Amino acid sequence: MHRCHPVRLARPVRPIRALMATLALSGALAGALCGAPPAAAQTLEKSTVRHGNVEVPVEIARPVGRGPWPAVLYIHAKRGYEDVDREHVRALARDGFLVMAPDWLAANMIERWPDRHVPESEGDVEAALVALRAHADACRQPVGVVAKSRGPYFAVRLAAKRPQDIGPIVSYYGHFQNPNAPEPQQLFSVAPEVSQIRSPVLMLIGDADFELRRMVNGRAFYLLWERGVPVELQMYPMARRAFDFRADQSPEEKMAARHATERERAWLRRWMALDAQGHCTGAAPR
């Protein structure tokens, strides 16, 4: 990393005015040589939304500047809502999205890594969707969804139930079957909602992920494609489950994570019909 040195003028100049000129020139040149200071970290606002008698914890990240902004619902995996999720939420906000992330485990005091699906948690995520749609700084259009592992199951359930509210879905190694379904259904079919939704779906998964998860992604991909729903499946070579944040990331997984971030941004912008600056236009997606 290069060091920045003070800039000296070639010859002395008159006091006061000269000093001001020197400071201005030095500041300009130092900025050019060193680059602008890094932007402050995106802050997260903690809040709650109500689902029946339950207060659902949510975190909200906003882009810099004034809204309205395109809105994204972030749905975490069954491992829980953690710092890696917070960084993903901040990154989405830096890309220009107003993001709300409900903690669907905490709302019902569910332990991390639950061995079954708790249907009540779907209402918690839906309550966050309703709050996000009504947010004063959200564009008045369907929201995008970024979801991980168990999260895409929530997403397709919501997209089938509230098609007017759900726009494009970005799925990271997603589960496209009811986790409580019998084993034969886990192996040979997908959730019935996959046959109903119209939301464009981008699937991001590694080719070294678990075989069952790769199979259910493949089945969901073919079913959506056959129905004419916009869908793409990005399979990353040599990438394992949680390739985008795992502590022992290989060089290939680090590149896959960067590529996935670019694909995520492009998918959301395309199917939310945003302009080149990432602003809402009100146009129909193409």
In which residue ranges do the predicted regions lie?
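Primarily recognizes the serine-hydrolase "nucleophile elbow" in alpha/beta-hydrolase
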Residues: 127-196
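Bacterial N-terminal signal peptides
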Residues: 17-35
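Short beta-strand/loop motif that positions the catalytic acidic residue
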Residues: 197, 203-205
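Short alpha-helix in the alpha/beta-hydrolase fold that links the catalytic acid
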Residues: 213-223
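Acidic catalytic loop of the alpha/beta-hydrolase fold
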Residues: 208-212
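Serine-hydrolase catalytic machinery in alpha/beta-hydrolase-like enzymes
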Residues: 44-62, 68-135, 242-248
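C-terminal catalytic histidine-bearing segment of alpha/beta-hydrolase fold enzymes
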Residues: 230-286
